[in-house]
Structure formats: C-alpha cells, structure tokens
C-alpha cells in the first residue's frame, strides 16, 4: 500500500451498506415466505436460526480470508482504495500486483476480502432486524421474550465490525486478528443461545433442574476450555506457526523442543516481530504451536468426558455429535501438521471448533428447557 492511500476512506460506505441490505433482504424474504401466517414470534425464531447459519458461514469465510492471505487484499476500510468494489479499484490493484505479484494485494485477494465484508454487513443487517423485531414484540405485549440479548448481540456485532476494520488498518496485528476470531465465535454463541428461546419457553425447575445441574457445570467448564483452545489456535494461525512442527506426536524430533515462551506469548506486537522490532524467533513460533498441541490433549479428554455425561443424561444424539466433532478436530489438526497445512483441513478445523462451541451452548439451553433423567447405574 502506498503512502497516499488512507487507512480509512468512508466515501463508499453508503454503497457498501446498500449491498449489505440486499444480502440481508434475501434470507429475510425467504423466512417471511416460510412462516407466512404464523406470527412475528415465529418469524424471529426462524430468522435467528438462519442468522446463526449465515454467521457460521461468515466465520468459515473469514478463516478462508485469513488462510489465503487476503486480509490486506484491500488495504483501506470500509471499501477498496476508496471504491465500493474491486472493479472500481482495478487500476490501483493492478499497480500493486505488478509491483508484488505474490504480495498482499491482488485482484483475487481483493475480491475475497470485499466479499467477506459484504457478507459481514449482511449478517449485521439481519442482527439489526432481530433486535428491532424483539423490541417491537415487547411493545406489542410479549414480556416473556427478552430484548436484551438481541440488543447486546447488535452491540457486539458492531464491536466485531470495529475489529474487522482494525485487522486491516493495523496490518494483521496478531492480537487484533485473534480477538476478531474470538469475537466471531462469541457471536455464534450469542445467536445459538437465542435460537433455542421461544416466547413460551420456561426454565426447568425443581428436581429436574437439580438433576441437570452437574451437566450444566460440565458444559460450562468444557466451553471455557474450548474457548481457551480456540484462542490458542487463533494465535497459532495468525502468527503462521502451524508448520514449525511437521511431525506428530513429536515436534522437531523431540517431545519437548526448544521453545521461547515469553517471546511467543508477548501479546501486543506486530506480525512476525517482537515489540522491540526484532524478528520473532523460531523458538517462539515453536512455543506457540506446541502449547496449542498440549492444550488439545486436555480439551479432547474433557470433551470425551462431556460426551459420556451427555449420554448418561439420555442426550445420545448430542453425545454422538460431540464425538463426531472431536474426531473431525483430531483429523484436521493432524492433517494441518503432516500434510503441510492444506486449505480444506485448515478451514474445517476452524469450523469444527466453532461448531463445537455452538453445540455446547445449545446443549446448555436444552438442559434448562427440558427435564433430564439420568440412566440408572
């Protein structure tokens, strides 16, 4: 990016918002047709599930954007060289591509980055509709339906947009990129929490609630461990530390390779450098990778224990789903190491972690809304 290109150029904002509105309209119209005549509560319930699905797609596309090195495909925000689409910026993109054919700015990377922004704008529009609909229902006399979860979700998606901008303008600063990933997973969790709520749902009380208390504690602990592991995985990816260990279970021929933990986990520093401006050492990258690998063993054990608890409480399909995701994570994680970080495996690894978080949140809600009867010993 040349010095004449501003980091922020708000000229194309209206056009980008219009494109986002068109993306918002498509699933909204589809849901309207599906729930025709069933009332606004049913509309919001179905729309929340659709928004959850599209947000999951957005997380996957964000992973592709990062893994294809397209994050700086348009080096300003919210547009591309001050234009709403890469078509209008084709001359600037071509000049940058001629200067660095394999650099961060190419026509393909510009389109990937802008498509990610368009989809994010569309998802933001859907969340705005959900928030407005929740408040409208409250004003129409539906006190059982919370307005604060949709309101907080709208606030959070705005925070996500800000982190998306900083990801570009701070040139893929690892801490910002990792926080952006975590924010996307948290957004999924918020939507999953709301997707299972209906106007007439009520928490389980009495003996049934007490019976499921241990399972809810286990779900919370497993979710916390998974959250830490996703953060570590994001740190591996954003620091490009995947390939420093290309064997399993050993790393560089050792079960405890040479590592520089303090340098590897110095959080506030630019990509590839320490806060002092020195190049990040190979030992630091090794520490980043190996900590994620070691944490994975603990997370796998926790998820297997959680699957057993789910089965013990007659949530058989939930247990099978969790086991399937654990297997997916193991296979894709190993593929990333021994096959040289193939794109499909890397994207599926991100998707598997996000799906696991959604499953845990949905299972938590299930224990609150339906009584659980443990299998007799």
Locate predicted features:
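Transmembrane alpha-helices
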Residues: 1-39
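Interfacial helix-loop-helix junctions of multi-pass membrane proteins
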Residues: 2-11, 61-74, 155-181, 235-247, ...
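Extracytosolic (periplasmic/ER-lumenal) interhelical loops and adjacent juxtamembrane/interface segments
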Residues: 2-3, 70-114, 242-285
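Membrane-interface loop-to-helix entry segments
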Residues: 11-20, 111-129, 174-187, 287-305, ...
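Alpha-helical transmembrane segments
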Residues: 24-34, 131-132, 192-195, 306-308, ...
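N-terminal signal-anchor transmembrane alpha helix
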Residues: 47-69, 224-236
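Membrane-interface helix-loop-helix junctions at transmembrane boundaries of multi-pass membrane enzymes
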Residues: 132-151, 307-322
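A juxtamembrane structural motif centered on a specific transmembrane helix
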Residues: 190-214, 218, 358-377
